[in-house]
Amino acid sequence: DLSVRGAYVDETRLYGNFTSLALAVQGQENQAIKAELICPQDFYEVNGVEVSLATALAEKMHQQAEQTIYQLTADNYEQLTDSPFEIAEQDEFWFDVKSGENTIAHRFVISGVHHSDLERLETDLSKICQSYVDWLGDTPFDDYLFMTMATSSDYGGLEHLASTSLITPRDDLPTFFEQAEPSESYQRFLGLCSHEYFHAWWVKTVRPEVFLNANFNQETYTTLLWVFEGFTSYVDDFMLQKSGVISQHSYLKLLAEQINRYYQTHGRALQSVAESSFDAWIKLYRSDENTANAGISYYNKGALVALCLDFALINHGKRIFDVIKVFYDKAKAQDNRRFGMTDANLDDVMNECLPKDVWQDFNAKYIDGTTELPLFELLSEQGVSIEQKDDDITWGMKYMSEPTGLKVQRVVRNSQAAAAGISANDVIVAIDGLKASEKWLKSTAKTQTISEDPAVCHVFRRDELLVLEVPPVSDAHVKQPQTWMLSIVNEKKVNVWMQI
């Protein structure tokens, strides 16, 4: 499993999460643990390169009988399973972050083939990390490790107590020709680093109460993932501009991508963001071609709920960053530096920051309900203009051209294609008697706006031929997704919003 969730071994790399490698001994989960990684000398001699160990655990190494043995120690089973390791050829750099009178060491290691400008990455990443510590006051860790694997196209990250494990397309890493303003692909990697780094405070330290002593034998459910992943998905890109690594203009482009994704998800009218949080195990991580029609992502909508909540708080002299800081301070007051959030104590904090009726109305409409988020109204109040650019999603379906015709990938709920009975994985071979092609599809759809006649499609579903009629567009069909672009019209208001 090459992902950040499991374990992986080949002749160049040993990687593992102890959740995949070490069973808990019932009743002894809180005892100190020693784990040994025994590597045969052959592993080091395959490519004749120097390899290193990366892990947030305390470690020692010694040689014995043609073997290299790494001894890792953890205070308990939780720390062991929350500290992945990698042994591989690695490039690395270190940087320090100031935390009051203290200096917090940060290590970044990267494996896999890459040709990236690590000096540029060090400069940018150190600014981002420093911005978090300046805001939150200190760190919940003594030192921190970024562990990254570069591949051709894989993407993901997983937060841990004092580290994060990342996998990224090598094209997302900074080049030696990177402009002062990071490229969109490099911004994506910085956003990933920012997201997982913030989780050290906002998931590992402050977390849903049901996660404090989670049972590893089963899934643990909560309706609060919109708070933890949603707030993080708002804060991660926000901190890129707050740190000065990207411009306000670039940040608005990233925010527009979130907004576009939200409006292209028709399931937002059917599922609340709280329900989406609860369904993470059974729906979000088992998505299919109908997911966008049936539900909403607590990452995506959660980020935009956080944006709207931040604007509501601004109107009452507070920020969402104040709310997060209140919970982090509660965690620091605990002996184990952990705090469990519940719906009740979230209400308590929000009622201190907002009038009670404002919070109750917001919660009922946008968190527990499916009322459309007032994004454009609120952005306009903060000095941001919104321009609309129509997307030509013909008949309300995503498709790809193949030699046999047009293969349908996804059908939008209540669209013309849905009304005709077209489904994902259908192959449209002919439209109105002519071979189906993207050009002919668009021409037919354009003609329908004038003639208002149905289009006759010959469609293969598996090996069965169907004849389906696609009606002309009408008010009964859902308005197709659109692209929104944001720009600054009032710099003074925007500057107030984009500071903490």
What kind of region is each of these model predictions?
Residues 43, 136-140, 196-205, 209, ...:
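A generic secondary-structure signal for well-formed alpha-helical elements
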Residues 143-148, 209-215, 244-255, 320-323:
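Short, glycine/acidic-rich hinge or "gate" loops at secondary-structure transitions
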Residues 28, 114, 118-125, 183-191, ...:
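Solvent-exposed, acidic/flexible segments
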Residues 1-130, 134-141, 154, 171:
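Non-catalytic architectural context of zinc metalloproteases
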Residues 96-225, 235:
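Juxtacatalytic substrate-recognition/specificity segment
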Residues 236, 246-500:
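C-terminal recognition in membrane/secretory proteostasis and scaffolding
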Residues 164-172, 205-206, 217-268:
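Post-HExxH zinc-binding segment in Zn-dependent metallohydrolases
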